[in-house]
Amino acid sequence: MDRLDRRLAATLLLFSFISFSTQKTSISWCVVSEAEEQKCLDLAGSATARNIRGTLLCVRGQSPTDCMEKIKNGTADAAAMFADDIYTAGWCFGLELAAGESYNGVDGISYYVVALARRSSSDLSLLEMHERSSCHPRIRTTVGWTVPIGFLVNTSQISVDEQCNFPKAVGDFFGYSCVPGVKDREHDPRGSNPKYLCEACIGDDNERHICVNNHRERHYGEAGALRCVAENLGDVAFVKHTTIFDNMDGNNMESWAMDLELEDLKLLCPDGSEAGPFDHETCHLAVVPANAVVVRPEDKCRVWKYLERLQNAFGNTTMFSSVGYTQSDLLFSDSTHHLLRVVGSYTSWLGPSYTTVLQAFECESLC
C-alpha cells in the first residue's frame, strides 16, 4: 500500500505541475494606434524589468470592433473600451469585463448626461420637447446623440421609421437644432439629413464652416452646446454634468462664458420637473459608466490578477498617464485613479439607465 500511495502522490504532483506549466501566463492587449502600441510596449518592458509575473504582449487592431473580434477568437485577450463599445462587445461578441476604471468620483461612474436650459425659459419640459430647439455637442456621441435621442425614443416622443432613420426623426421632431457633423458625408452619405439639424449652428467668425464636426463651428463640443443655449439660439443643451463648471469662474475666457451666471441656468429632469445645476445626481438623463477592460468570460480572473499586479507595482503614474506620447488616453483614460475588479456582468456595469438608452437603437443592427 505504501508503494501505491507514493506512486499516486507522484502522479498527482506531476499532473499539478503539468497543469500549472500549461496555464497561459501572457496577456495580449489589443491596441488601435501607433502611440497606444508604443505605450503598451513600454509598459511591457517596465513590467519585465520589475519581474512582474506574467508577460504583457501588444496586438494591433484596426478599431474597437476589430479588437472585439480578436478577443473573441483568442488572438488578443483584453482591451479597455468606452461604454458604447462595452455594450457591443457583450451583446454581439459574448465578452465580459475584468476591470473598470475609477476616477475621483464614485466607482464605476464616468459622468452624468444632463439637459441644460436657461432659467428664464418657461413652459419647458423634457416630456414636451416637440418643436423646441436643441443644442448637441456633435453627432453620434454618447452625450450629444445616443443618450438624448434614446431618451426621446423611450418616452415615445420620437418614433423611427422602418429604415431606422434617426436624423430624419430628430429633424422632424425639434423645431431646429445644432448637431455638428450631421451633414458631413460620413454621417449623411446621401445628403438627406434634415437641414433643420444645422439651423442653430453659427460656424466660425466669418460665418463659414457652419455645422462642421470640429471647433470651426463655434457651437461644437460641450462648451459650444452650452454657448448655443447661453446665446438664446437653443432651448436645451445636452451635455455632461461638468460642462457648466468647466466654463465658469474664469475657466473659459470667451465673452459669452464670462457673462454667464450660475443662477441663469437650470436642469430639466426626465419626469418633467426642473432642478438646479448642482442637482445632477438626481436630475439626469443617464449615468454613463466608466471605461472597462473587455475580456473573454473565462479570462475575467486571470486578466484582473495581472492588472492588479501591474497596479500594485506602478500605481497611476506609468499605467494611466500618457504624458510623453502623441495622444491622450492610451491603454486607459489619463484621468484614471485606479482600476477596480468587475465581478458582475457587463450589463450590471453599464447600469439600467444607460442600457435602456442603448436599446432604443437596436434597429441599427449593432451585430
Curated annotation (Swiss-Prot):
Xref: PROSITE patterns: TRANSFERRIN_LIKE_4 (PS51408)
Please give the organism.
Answer: Oncorhynchus mykiss
The subcellular location is: Secreted
Can you give the residue ranges of the Transferrin-like domain? Answer: 27-363
Where is it made, tissue-wise?
A: Expressed in the sacculus during the day.
Q: What's this protein's name? A: Otolith matrix protein 1
List the CDD domains.
Answer: PBP2_transferrin (cd13529)
Gene Ontology terms, cellular component aspect? early endosome; extracellular space; plasma membrane; recycling endosome
The record's function comment reads: Required for normal otolith growth and deposition of otolin-1 in the otolith.
Q: Which UniProt keywords apply?
A: Secreted, Signal
Signal peptide residues on this chain, from the entry's feature table: 1-23
Q: How does it assemble?
A: Interacts with OTOL1.
Q: Origin, by domain of life?
A: Eukaryota
Q: Which family does it belong to?
A: Belongs to the transferrin family.
The cross-references to InterPro entries, in alphabetical order and at most eight, read: Transferrin-like_dom (IPR001156)
Any Pfam family = Transferrin
Which example biological process does GO assign this protein?
Answer: iron ion transport
